[in-house]
Structure formats: structure tokens, C-alpha cells
């Protein structure tokens, strides 16, 4: 075989109301099977079918490519075949956040700010000396063994091509209530394959009268570009 195409995940009956799991790893012998397949030396393409984000960091590391199909329905077969054989270029973005470990849950991109926001410079369990005294590490909102970042954030998704953003501009730097902020930028397909990018506009209010999320999705636009094509994009953000 030129490559290995492995389908893993969960049955649909495991998803839905009152179908919670305490362990979000791949169930049964699936993870072990993938590791054995990766040891063959053949390129490993993993397709995950599940109704929830699973903790698949180890499987991502041993796979040459991974497609998260969720539960695609009765026409999922032809759709997956078109994606895997390159008839269609992937353009989907994650509608949820994928944790590194189950213990990171709840984890989501639009959480509100805390009194101890993570800075990214915190210590972790691997940098604490053996026999260290019991004292404060100065940590904030942080997991000693998993950090603050997810495995894959909300809005993440790859393609068979690549895109570059440039020349970001705002219509003004000062606004009043009920005005509209105009955001413009250039989007370029820098790869050799035609593809579709979903441009996402996020914002954060640093001086609100009430606590606001650290990041909020305000708008998105689906843009198809031929290989090498550049397009000037305009997005609007009501104040």
C-alpha cells in the first residue's frame, strides 16, 4: 500500500443529551492500533468521526494528516472521498475548542478575563526542581502539566493551499456609538492549488463598563481564490 487510511472515533449513539464521557481519549484499542500502523513506515492518514472534541494530541503527532469529520451523515462517504482524493479542497474551521487533556475542560476561546490572567511565562511541572520548597510559583490561570493553550483553538483549520494576510487597515482609530468600523486587508492564495479561506474577524473591548470576553468573533467571510490570486477584502464591525 502507498499509504494507510485509518478511520477511528465514536459511534453516533455516544453523542447527544445525557451521553457524557469522563474520558475523551479514543475509546478501546484505537489509539494503540494507530501507533502500530504508524510503525509500519507508511504515511498514515487518520479520519476521526465523533460528535465531540476528543483529546487526540498523541494521534495528531503520529499521523501524517488528520481529518476531523465529526458525524457527517448519510452523504459523508462521498464528501470524505472528495476531500481525501483532492477533488475538493478543505476549508472548514473548527466550531469548538479542542483540549490537550480532559482536565483542561471547560476550555473555550471567548472566556471572560480573570484577576489572574495567564501570561505565557509561567513555570510548568517539568521546570520545578526535585525537592523544591513549598512556595508560590507565581502562576496565574495555568495548568502545570498542560499549559494554557488548547490543542486546536476555535476557528482553526488547514487547507491544501496556504493564505497570507497583508495591508490591514482601519477606517479610523476613534469611534462613537452606532458607528461602523471598516476593516480592509489583502488576502493572497500563496499556494499552488485553488482554495477557499474563511477570513475571521475578532475583537476585544479593553475598556468596557461590564466584563467582556478576551476575544469575540464578530464576522467572517468565505473567500475563494485561485492559486496566486490576491483580493482586497472589506469587513464591517458595528460599534
What are these regions (language model features)?
Residues 29-34, 44-46, 66, 80:
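Extended, hydrophobic alpha-helical segments in both membrane/secreted and soluble proteins
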Residues 12-17, 54-57, 210-211:
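Short acidic/His/Gly/Ser-rich catalytic and metal-binding motifs that mark active-site loops
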Residues 209-239:
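Intrinsically disordered, low-complexity Pro/Gly/Ser/Thr-rich segments with frequent PxxP/GP/PP motifs
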Residues 1-4, 40-45, 62-64, 90-92:
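Loop/turn elements at helix/coil->beta-strand transitions in domains of secreted/extracellular proteins
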Residues 8-27:
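Glycine/threonine-rich flexible loop motifs
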Residues 49-196, 202, 227:
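Secreted, periplasmic, or luminal enzymes acting at the cell surface/secretory milieu
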Residues 192-209, 215-217:
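Short acidic, flexible loop segments centered on an aromatic residue
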Residues 6-7, 68:
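Redox-cofactor binding/interface segments in oxidoreductases and associated redox assembly factors
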Amino acid at each position: 500500500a502507498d499509504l494507510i487510511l485509518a478511520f477511528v472515533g465514536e459511534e453516533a449513539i455516544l453523542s447527544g443529551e445525557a451521553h457524557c464521557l469522563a474520558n475523551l481519549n479514543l475509546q478501546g484499542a484505537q489509539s494503540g492500533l494507530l501507533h502500530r500502523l504508524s510503525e509500519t513506515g507508511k504515511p498514515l492518514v487518520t479520519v476521526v468521526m465523533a460528535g465531540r472534541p476528543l483529546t487526540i494530541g498523541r494521534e495528531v503527532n503520529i499521523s501524517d494528516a488528520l481529518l476531523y469529520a465529526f458525524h457527517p451523515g448519510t452523504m459523508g462517504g462521498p464528501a470524505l472521498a472528495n476531500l481525501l482524493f483532492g477533488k475538493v479542497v478543505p476549508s472548514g474551521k473548527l466550531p469548538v475548542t479542542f483540549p490537550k487533556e480532559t482536565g483542561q475542560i471547560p476550555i473555550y476561546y471567548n472566556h471572560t478575563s480573570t484577576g489572574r490572567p495567564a501570561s505565557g511565562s509561567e513555570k510548568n511541572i517539568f521546570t520545578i526542581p526535585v525537592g523544591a520548597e513549598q512556595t508560590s510559583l507565581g502562576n496565574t490561570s495555568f495548568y502545570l502539566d498542560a499549559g494554557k493553550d488548547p490543542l486546536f483553538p476555535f476557528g482553526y483549520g488547514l487547507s491544501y493551499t496556504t493564505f497570507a494576510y497583508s495591508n490591514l487597515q482601519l477606517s479610523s482609530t476613534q469611534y462613537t456609538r452606532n458607528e461602523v468600523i471598516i476593516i480592509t486587508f489583502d488576502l493572497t492564495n500563496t499556494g499552488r492549488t485553488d482554495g477557499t479561506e474563511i477570513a475571521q474577524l475578532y475583537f476585544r473591548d479593553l475598556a468596557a463598563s461590564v466584563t467582556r470576553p478576551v476575544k469575540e468573533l464578530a464576522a467572517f467571510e468565505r473567500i475563494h481564490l485561485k492559486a496566486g490570486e490576491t483580493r482586497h477584502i472589506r469587513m464591517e464591525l458595528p460599534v
